[in-house]
Structure formats: structure tokens, C-alpha cells
From Swiss-Prot:
Translated by a ribosomal termination-reinitiation process from the bicistronic mRNA coding for VP1 and VP2. Homooligomer. The portal-like structure consists in 12 copies of VP2. Interacts with capsid protein VP1. The keyword NAD does not apply. The keyword Lipid metabolism does not apply. Belongs to the vesivirus VP2 protein family. Transmembrane segments: none annotated. This is Minor capsid protein VP2. It comes from Feline calicivirus (strain CFI/68 FIV). Minor structural protein that forms a portal-like structure at a unique three-fold axis of symmetry, following binding to the host receptor. The virion attaches to feline junctional adhesion molecule A (F11R). Once attached, the virion is endocytosed. Acidification of the endosome induces conformational change of capsid protein thereby injecting virus genomic RNA into host cytoplasm. The channel formed by VP2 may allow the delivery of the viral genome through the host endosomal membrane. Signal peptide: none annotated. GO terms for cellular component: host cell cytoplasm; viral capsid, decoration. Pfam families: Vesi_VP2.
Amino acid sequence: MNSILGLIDTVTNTIGKAQQIELDKAALGQQRELALQRMNLDRQALNNQVEQFNKLLEQRVQGPIQSVRLARAAGFRVDPYSYTNQNFYDDQLNAIRLSYRNLFKN
């Protein structure tokens, strides 16, 4: 009688463990999906931040350049080699963009 009860107990434990393994597998699958969704959302958020950063940077750069153009159009003499030079700002903008892109590469 004890051997039959022991056998039933062993089978019950084995089935319970098998069910727990299946539940763990399902939970891991769901966690993986959630992790992938979270990674995609993080990537989208980073892309949005990069776009906002680029827009802000272009506004800051284009402001002084536009001021120089307006000053020249108004007849003022503007030093072409000053820090407001177009090439200087383009170089700075490209350098910052490249470093920012490299920071968030996949």
C-alpha cells in the first residue's frame, strides 16, 4: 500500500514539476516579448531625442548664420573668418551629429 501511495506521490510530483516547467516557459516567452517591445520603445524614444537634438542644434546654428546674412544684406561689414562663419558651424554641426549617432548605434 505504501509503495502505491509513494508511486502516486512521485507521479503527482513529476506532473506538477512538468506543469511548472511549461508555465515557466510560457512566462519566459511573454517576458521576452515584453523585453523586445520595451527595447523597440526605447529605440523609438532615442530616435525622437536625436531628432529633437538635431532640430535644436540647427536652430542654434542657423540663428547666427542668418544674423550674419542679414547684417551683410544691411550693408554691415562682417568678418568672413569669424566664429559665425557658415563652414565653421557646418563642421561643428556635422561633428556633433556624428558623435551623437555613434553614441546610440545598435
